[in-house]
Amino acid sequence: MPIAPDRVRHPEKANRPDNPIQRKPEWLRVKAPTSPEYGETRSLMRGLRLNTVCEEAACPNIGECWKKKHATFMILGAVCTRACAFCNVATGRPDQLDPHEPEKVAEAVAHLKLEHIVVTSVDRDDLEDGGAGHFARTIRAIRAAAPGTTIEVLTPDFMKKKGAVETVVEARPDVFNHNLETAPRLYPTIRPGARYFTSLQLLARVKEIDPSMFTKSGIMVGLGETKEEVFQVMDDLRAADVDFMTIGQYLAPTPKHAKVDRFVTPDEFAGYVTVGRGKGFLMVASSPLTRSSYHAGADFERLRAAREAKLAGRPVAAPEATSAE
């Protein structure tokens, strides 16, 4: 279940000074979620006692996605064992694992008749396998309940626990996503519980195990990185043979989180698409509101078409930039 409203979500940030709230530019304004479909999706998640990253991470696209009955399921509980400076997911002592969660996720996928599903999780450094087995069971449960649904996983780094990546890959998701989140220079303050090159090694390992599996990774911009650092991240991801990169604007969930250094313009985001395509990515989704799972289903179809075109020696059509509409 989602975190109770009266629970302190980020006790480790409680004594930090507040950062000033910045007014968002017009291109980052979104409508409040009010559609009947939004309410139906929310009720289904509550009824099955499931968590979504859409709610827990305060995603700005929740109204649009839930109106379309698209949701990103967050497994392994609602409390994370790490405390990244950018993330709204609650931190602290993690929940007991729900052994029936894989089947509940599969039930929701079948009920919503989803063509493509994204499954992510909190970090569970307390578990022997980091939660990899739970990911694998969830993938298999979805395959059994909705065999026509394509599956994308967005995993933590599993703290380099032996066999964890192999366990997830062997369950055969269609896309394996693991986000770098930001440039390596910013890791000590933005992602202190993780290591940049550990994440790169994880992505490279996925391709070693199964070269046919699509891999994906994303970063946020507006945290103080330079364009040159973004280009270096692109090069590092391509060296790991990553197929698809996402780039979106960082938005501070609360005044206690890392401050927004600047709002990157839509033209700059479009420029990253051009550069990324030139570096060899099959797909680059880059816009102010781009998030890892935003338009994931449509992007998966484009990704598959891009690979087919490349293998056939045809020009790979450049995808349209992801809009905020």
Curated annotation (Swiss-Prot):
Key words, A-Z: 4Fe-4S, Cytoplasm, Iron, Iron-sulfur, Metal-binding, S-adenosyl-L-methionine, Transferase
Pfam families per the UniProt record, alphabetical: LIAS_N, Radical_SAM
SMART domains for the chain: Elp3
InterPro entries associated with the record: Aldolase_TIM (IPR013785), Elp3/MiaA/NifB-like_rSAM (IPR006638), LIAS_N (IPR031691), Lipoyl_synth (IPR003698), rSAM (IPR007197)
Pathway connected to this protein: Protein modification; protein lipoylation via endogenous pathway; protein N(6)-(lipoyl)lysine from octanoyl-[acyl-carrier-protein]: step 2/2
Catalysed reactions listed for this entry: [[Fe-S] cluster scaffold protein carrying a second [4Fe-4S](2+) cluster] + N(6)-octanoyl-L-lysyl-[protein] + 2 oxidized [2Fe-2S]-[ferredoxin] + 2 S-adenosyl-L-methionine + 4 H(+) = [[Fe-S] cluster scaffold protein] + N(6)-[(R)-dihydrolipoyl]-L-lysyl-[protein] + 4 Fe(3+) + 2 hydrogen sulfide + 2 5'-deoxyadenosine + 2 L-methionine + 2 reduced [2Fe-2S]-[ferredoxin]
Signal peptide span: none
Protein name: Lipoyl synthase
High-level lineage: Bacteria, Pseudomonadati, Pseudomonadota, Alphaproteobacteria, Rhodospirillales
